[in-house]
Amino acid sequence: RVTEQMKNEADTEYYGVISIGTPPESFKVIFDTGSSNLWVSSSHCSAQACSNHNKFKPRQSSTYVETGKTVDLTYGTGGMRGILGQDTVSVGGGSDPNQELGESQTEPGPFQAAAPFDGILGLAYPSIAAAGAVPVFDNMGSQSLVEKDLFSFYLSGGGANGSEVMLGGVDNSHYTGSIHWIPVTAEKYWQVALDGITVNGQTAACEGCQAIVDTGTSKIVAPVSALANIMKDIGASENQGEMMGNCASVQSLPDITFTINGVKQPLPPSAYIEGDQAFCTSGLGSSGVPSNTSELWIFGDVFLRNYYTIYDRTNNKVGFAPAA
């Protein structure tokens, strides 16, 4: 098993350091269960977004192999276009030879320029990997670098350090109680069925919908009308897609309870309201997708900080246990 420590960037992003090439160069990457490709900024990129980051220099690596393929990725808040190469990648002490990785030529969108990380390491299923690239975890598995075909996340709160992702194992010190296992409904993202969402015992949204468990998204993302219902139920107002609560009365706000695979998972206001007394926003945002198309939720870090999560590829299940 391989353990990678992650830095908590203001409770919005979690990234760890990997190395690529020979001799190894270090890069900060987000370990993202919502995508499947590995990519980093590279010397091919002259865009402003790349200038603030470590750039991978393939010509300086003796183990680099060209593939002749290109890769194009889009994310909720940005993207990356570039070429696909192959090199040795080291994660948490485990060395992964012949790993396919994207090298950015352009990184459109303002998001990447200010980002504290140099790239993204995707941990979703190979079926959604762009350019047919083999994801890092699959490649490590095929080379027997991990004991078990699962990985797990602990995300710290309050800006604290100590966050980790364990590839090939489970860290029992990071959770209490029992693990609640949920079947994956589509082997693309880590997608699960959500039975319903209640506030004060009443259904607020989603009578049977789908959710993606996504460590690379900071908020809980909801369809527009579902978010409006929940805001009404907890007495919050909206401002440009950000939900405002009455900060002084956070303690008196109700839990938002998500029922997943028959088990109630309550989210207390201390978890979904962020900020201080003067100004606060909720950790829920809108996907901009009307609910009548397909009611898809994203469980981002606001939700995941409350749980130790285990992603089991052998049995295609996600495990949730209360974080310790």
UniProtKB/Swiss-Prot annotation:
Any GO BP annotation: proteolysis
UniProt entry tagged with the keyword Transferase: no
Organism lineage string: Eukaryota, Metazoa, Chordata, Craniata, Vertebrata
InterPro entries in UniProt: Aspartic_peptidase_A1, Aspartic_peptidase_AS, PEPTIDASE_A1, Peptidase_aspartic_dom_sf
Ranges of compositional bias, category Polar residues: 96-107
Enzyme class: hydrolase
Family statement: Belongs to the peptidase A1 family.
Boundaries of every Peptidase A1 domain copy: 14-321
Region: Disordered, residue numbers: 86-109
UniProt-recorded name of the protein: Pepsin-2B
Active-site residue numbers: D32, D214
One GO molecular-function entry: aspartic-type endopeptidase activity
Any single Pfam family the record assigns to this protein: Asp
Keywords: Aspartyl protease, Digestion, Disulfide bond, Hydrolase, Protease
Keyword Disulfide bond: yes
